[in-house]
Amino acid sequence: MARRPQRPAPSGRAGAGRGAAGAAPPGPDARLVVLGEFGRAHGLQGEVRLKSYTAEPMAIGGYGPLLASDGRVVELTALRPAAGTPDILVARVAGVAGRSAAEGLNRLTLSVPRDRLGAPEDEDEFFTADLVGLAAVDAAGTRLGTIRAVPNYGGGDLLEIEPEGGGRPALLPFTRLFVPKVEIAAGRVTIAPPEDLFAPPGPPPEGEG
């Protein structure tokens, strides 16, 4: 069973850098797992909206220093839920004061090294991040490609698969219908893709483009 990173949710303050027992900033060669993404500035005091990808949204505050996609190390100093959307938070960030500075965070993703997540509690569980780099094979064991990412655009997890031999990556829903078997230890997942999964996009309908 796949799961997303989860820790006991802090209350009120995120405590980054303290709640993680002084965890060091991620190294440049670490295998990274994306935990969230900043959105637009919130108000005038330097707060910013944050979409959390952890199983419990507030748990993103318990991982210590986070690596932003622009290379900076980010410390979340306070978190609170935003109104109306459970996975959207309002965050305060160390060193960010005022709306202009908060706007500079928009669209930056926040990551941690995979080894900071530890192991899932149950033997048959795994993190979606563990799928990255695995071979995608068919029922006969023929390698069809390699999993490069596990994005989620709001409709469920997807496998981004780079076809064997190169070519344009394709997205496959990460459901039992299309992914009947996951073998982390063997380094592969068995997929049952539609025939046109790796087909190049066709020409636009006549009259368009």
Curated annotation (Swiss-Prot):
Subcellular locations according to the entry: Cytoplasm
Q: Which GO terms describe its biological process?
A: ribosomal small subunit biogenesis; rRNA processing
Per UniProt, the keywords (alphabetical) are: Chaperone, Cytoplasm, Ribosome biogenesis, rRNA processing
List, in alphabetical order, the Gene Ontology terms for molecular function in this entry: ribosome binding
The main location is cytoplasm
Q: How does it assemble?
A: Binds ribosomal protein uS19.
Q: What is this protein called?
A: Ribosome maturation factor RimM
Tell me what organism the protein belongs to: Methylobacterium sp. (strain 4-46)
Q: Which gene specifies this protein's sequence?
A: rimM
